[in-house]
A protein has these predicted regions:
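Short C-terminal domain-edge/linker segments immediately following a structured domain
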Residues: 38-40, 72, 119-124
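Electropositive, glycine-dotted interaction segments
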Residues: 85, 92-163
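Generic marker of residues within folded, mature protein domains
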Residues: 10-12, 19, 76-80, 110-111, ...
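Short amphipathic alpha-helical surface micro-motifs
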Residues: 1-4, 9-11, 23-24, 28, ...
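Conserved P-loop NTP-binding catalytic core
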Residues: 43-113
Length: 163
């Protein structure tokens, strides 16, 4: 049965880094208020439904992890700019339609150079687009308008939500 196998989050809302493994049949998120249950669901929606695809870049203030923003402010540089990475690993039948579109080597956060099915969302500063912003960055300003939001499959294909 096709399902979400695992989730990796870096720099999204309250999570600096989080890995979640899912059960094939049923998953229940249980916890106190404000521990991140809804954030896990938002991360999945962000990847699969391309949530925020056409949103104003000012929304990034609410999406970037506050600890990562504080670390940037303490040591402002292009290398310390906060970013978001969310990877959803899928368990797909290799013979199913479009399975090859999602199958490829994983080089991202999972750091296992395995071949898996999945989709990766990345939100990061685009140095080429933001050429000339270095001084502003060194002053501790995050250039949200020069961030790119990209959705790619593990096969390095652009991901478009299937309707």
């Amino acid at each position: 049965m096709n399902h979400i196998k695992s989730l990796h989050i870096e720099g999204f809302k309250k999570f600096v880094s989080l890995d979640v493994e899912f059960n094939e049949h049923m998953n229940i998120l249980v916890g106190e208020n404000e521990v991140g249950k809804s954030t896990i669901l938002d991360a999945i929606k962000t990847v699969l439904n391309q949530q925020y695809r056409n949103a104003d870049k000012s929304i990034l203030r609410d999406l970037l992890n506050k600890q990562m923003v504080a670390a940037f402010e303490a040591n402002p540089s292009v290398k310390t700019l906060p970013r978001i990475l969310i990877e959803v690993e899928l368990a797909l039948d290799p013979k199913s339609k479009n399975a090859d579109y999602f199958y490829g080597e994983v080089y991202g956060a999972l750091k296992k150079q395995d071949e898996k099915f999945g989709i990766r969302f990345e939100c990061r500063y685009d140095e080429a687009l933001g050429a000339g912003m270095e001084q502003s960055i060194l002053e501790g300003k995050i250039p949200y308008e020069y961030y790119n939001l990209t959705w790619m499959t593990f096969a390095n294909n652009p991901y478009q939500m299937m309707r």
